[in-house]
Amino acid sequence: MASSAQSSGSSGGPAVPTVQRGIVKMVLSGCAIIVRGQPRGGPPPERQINLSNIRAGNLARRAAATQPDGKDTPDEPWAFPAREFLRKKLIGKEVCFTIENKTPQGREYGMIYLGKDTNGENIAESLVAEGLATRREGMRANNPEQNRLSECEEQAKASKKGMWSEGNGSHTIRDLKYTIENPRHFVDSHHQKPVNAIIEHVRDGSVVRALLLPGHHLVTVMLSGIKCPTFRRETDGSETPEPFAAEAKFFTESRLLQRDVQIILESCHNQNLLGTILHPNGNITELLLKEGFARCVDWSIAVYTRGAEKLRAAERFAKERRLRIWRDYVPPTANLDQKDKQFVAKVMQVLNADAIVVKLNSGDYKTIHLSSIRPPRLEGDNIQDKNKKLRPLYDIPYMFEAREFLRKKLIGKKVNVTVDYIRPASPATETVPAFSERTCATVTIGGINIAEALVSKGLATVIRYRQDDDQRSSHYDELLAAEARAIKNGKGLHSKKEVPIHRVADISGDTQKAKQFLPFLQRAGRSEAVVEYVFSGSRLKLYLPKETCLITFLLAGIECPRGARNLPGLVQEGEPFSEEATLFTKELVLQREVEVEVESMDKAGNFIGWLHMDGANLSVLLVEQALSKVHFTAERSAYYKPLLSAEEAAKQRKEKVWAHYEERPVEEVMPVLEEKERSASYKPVFVTEITDDLHFYVQDVETGTQLEKLMENMRNDISSHPPVEGSYAPRRGEFCIAKFVDGEWYRARVEKVESPAKVHVFYIDYGNREILPSTRLGTLPPAFSTRVLPAQATEYAFAFIQVPQDEDARTDAVDSVVRDIQNTQCLLNVEHLSASCPHVTLQFADSKGDVGLGLVKEGLVMVEVRKEKQFQKVITEYLNAQESAKSARLNLWRYGDFRADDADEFGYSR
């Protein structure tokens, strides 16, 4: 404690009390304070000073816990205002003081002055002058200090200040509340809005006692998300500080004790509240971490309203500099190159609910485990009979839902992988099986953390670690927050509802059951299925959701190379290209949704048929890739021609199974040409856009899968290398990419540039137009240009009809067409060409009804009479329909046949 002695003017005069200095740490009451010195390598010494010659009211005191019958003592009138007067004036300020008297018990009484010397404000006089304290009776009246106190008291009485005002001062007595009946409700009632408070006591660096205003709740607040070293209570009642506990406590005390603060109440733990303390000079939670006085704690970091990442970053700052509690910190060794730590890969398979198999750019496969999460598992009453074979996917509650969530989100998609840690291999023990080395990573797609999404749906739980274990997800706090939301909302594993049960019949190899199922599957035609496993290029295990069964499925119509087999006493080697065929089938259909046509079954209970994915026949694809040959049984199938064509092309290339093929000379046969009458050749199309002049744009259904694949690859490429906003300068006629209102990128062509804010674009694959700012445009990557795949939207007009020139009538016709065919599949036949676009007839895919004829029947359009001989039959049908509409006075004809006199006025011609 700093001090300075002031000597008297002459050696014979009375001794002048020594003037000492200190910083006010705490105000105990209206007449007592605690001062401290400057810190020197640790918390400084402290000293209690009681003001001489005055008395202030006693503050409230809670009954001792050891006296259950004891009663709480309330504030005396004006006691709290006196304390507040001193607190606001003195806390954290430098004062000087003189000691006038010291009792045998060690209590020190003296005078306190604000500032560095006794010329400063006399605190006792200020209290008395404000009517917040009284002069003690019985003191010597001729003492100058007493005289000044007496004068101050008389002035306060005259001015009716403080306790000399009218009334008994009951309004200054606080209604202190020491306990809260329902802490959770109390926290929620404040809706995380800052609450004014005074910090009354600091237990350790991260736990304080606070007086909440204006309700005067005296509560214990633990700082959310962190923990400082504490003081361990020994059996003899003494306290032993952990390393840096005293320093952390002083750090918090010197900044917050008896300061006005705001507290955001975030949660509760027993009777203690969790919160964040806000002070004008900063956030104590983050400061403690940054200075190495605290560490993050997982159990409460999720409720920290300002973002757990800020706390983790502050902790990292202290760790990297080995500050205080981190002085012995050793960072985990990084044994991965950057290219191995972060990469983009394609998801090929989902393993249960916490791991995936990905294909790297090098072509290698790698198993990735999702960091810090645990898939659903059997617990308690759910543990099954040991004699029954466990099928985890179907028997563990929510395992199937978790796997399906990942499968639908990820299979065939490119994801971003960030390796968080590598879990070393562990040997088996009596209770735990052996584990090989695991690569644990955070996997994201479209900016979404897959592990976090799983946890938020209650389909996985978060692993709890030791506090010093850094081997965890780089987004661990987000996982904890997601789990808290899932628990609160009762999602998945946290639901109180009955767990879903999946009764899946496995009829693989069960001949009797297979015979029972065969007629149903044959009658069903194409059935939906999920490929669960690929045994070889042509042998798969399928899950049929509608029938809730598992079957073994053999591809019909082909001979696929056999793989290696384990036979009794020997291993039979696989045929050439068997592994390539298996890999091809795996990459194409494993865990994909497919359609199957069951034709028959073999004697082992395996079903035989055709498998289609995205409109492609897997048997044909294997033959195309020269990984299979056509089997003679295909002759009686509807797919024989495409199989033969695919095989012939593969033979010509002399690849793989046809590498040694020698073409046999064939006898040339002259084709006989037959004259046939003209017949309409309708092809399936998908209508994407209807224009205001009743033209429409369609996509060819046969090339639809190519467009889907191109769009998927293009968007993955754009998400990996997004265009720099505003870097693209659009030019008329140029192909580009444009971000539509749905937030997705599409191929487009620039039609007109009014300004950078108004660029007219045409979506070349869908036929719609839009005006966009150039910031929503980008350069079309060459890999997705129209050379790779031509524009998929083709413009057509209806043949044999005239579009109304009247705007209202034309709108009626357009609205009708939009309702009937937009975004639907139809059948299209080109009838004749024109300067603008081909004119066609369009049929509904299901009913085969003529769309244009329907418009005529409804009286929405008129017939365009053409003279060509081949059209006379259809023109007659259209004219008959028009006469029926006229007779019924429908739409255009509601006022009769208007064409006789004013056809020109309305823009019609007969």
Curated annotation (Swiss-Prot):
Modified residues (Phosphoserine): S426, S645, S785, S909
UniProt KW Nuclease keyword: yes
Record InterPro entries: Silence_cplx_Nase-comp_TudorSN, SNase_OB-fold_sf, Staphylococal_nuclease_OB-fold, Thermonucl_AS, Tudor, Tudor_TDRD11
Domain Tudor: from-to ranges: 729-787
Cross-link type Glycyl lysine isopeptide (Lys-Gly) (interchain with G-Cter in SUMO2), residue numbers: K513
Gene3D superfamilies associated with the record: 2.30.30.140, 2.40.50.90
PROSITE patterns assigned to the protein according to its UniProt record, in alphabetical order: TNASE_2, TNASE_3, TUDOR
Primary location class: cytoplasm
Any one Gene Ontology molecular-function term assigned to this protein's record: endonuclease activity, active with either ribo- or deoxyribonucleic acids and producing 3'-phosphomonoesters
SUBUNIT field: Forms a ternary complex with STAT6 and POLR2A. Associates with the RNA-induced silencing complex (RISC). Interacts with the RISC components AGO2, FMR1 and TNRC6A. Interacts with GTF2E1 and GTF2E2. Interacts with PIM1. Interacts with STAT5. Interacts with SYT11 (via C2 2 domain); the interaction with SYT11 is direct.
Protein's name in the database: Staphylococcal nuclease domain-containing protein 1
Originating organism: Mus musculus (Mouse)
